[in-house]
Curated annotation (Swiss-Prot):
Pfam families: Cyclotide. Residues 1-20 form the signal peptide. InterPro entries: Cyclotide (IPR005535), Cyclotide_moebius_CS (IPR012324), Cyclotide_sf (IPR036146). Residues 21-66, 96-120, 150-174, 204-207 form a propeptide. This is Varv peptide A/Kalata-B1. The presence of a 'disulfide through disulfide knot' structurally defines this protein as a knottin.
Length: 207
């Protein structure tokens, strides 16, 4: 009987650790399922440190915002040692998730929504809409060109939005978006914003 109790207690204490590890290494497919089901909103910030998200953000940065963050090493010998980096001579840059991210329209459109809101404009879809119609999926007419804006509904996903903000804060996108209010009195009323005097900026994931 004592042996049975010890085994049950051991299993109970082992479960949380195993679950935490599983969250840390969440796969792209599992993350996509969470987003589809709306379950990602209720998860802990552990998921935000997922390399899937970070590399998707980097891929987006390369494709839409004109450059890749540097990995902190050179590749004069043709090799990069940092995981997720490859040689863009003479430096190593992050670009490991290009193909996988491209097949995830949910992430791409969420990133686009963030770009529209925080970086002052939408990426262009590569076609004009003089006739009022856009043929590219996820694009609509902002005359005279088509722009990506199909996933406005993705904005309420705080987990994604805050991960994007954390990425922006790292310096890869040139700073934090301003929240649209001042904080002369030291307080910010917009959710997810705090005072970077004299304005409020989005930094909900600083913790």
């Amino acid at each position: 009987m004592k042996m049975f109790i010890v085994l049950v207690l051991s299993a109970a204490f082992a479960l949380p650790a195993a679950f935490a590890t599983e969250q840390d290494v969440i796969t792209l497919q599992a993350y996509e399922e969470l987003l589809k089901n709306g379950a990602a909103n209720g998860m802990t910030k552990t998921v935000i440190s997922s390399p899937v998200l970070e590399e998707a953000l980097v891929s987006y940065s390369k494709n839409k915002l004109g450059g890749l963050p540097v990995c902190g090493e050179t590749c004069v010998g043709g090799t990069c040692n940092t995981p997720g980096c490859s040689c863009s001579w003479p430096v190593c840059t992050r670009n490991s998730l290009e193909s996988t991210k491209s097949a995830n329209p949910l992430l791409e459109e969420a990133l686009t929504a963030f770009a529209k809101k925080g970086l002052g404009g939408l990426p262009v879809c590569g076609e004009t809409c003089v006739g009022g119609t856009c043929n590219t999926p996820g694009c609509t007419c902002s005359w005279p060109v088509c722009t990506r804006n199909a996933l406005e509904t993705q904005k309420p996903n705080h987990l994604l939005e805050e991960a994007l903000v954390a990425f922006a804060k790292k310096g890869n996108l040139g700073g934090l978006p301003v929240c649209g209010e001042t904080c002369v009195g030291g307080t910010c009323n917009t959710p997810g914003c705090s005072c970077s005097w004299p304005v409020c900026t989005r930094n909900a994931l600083a913790m």
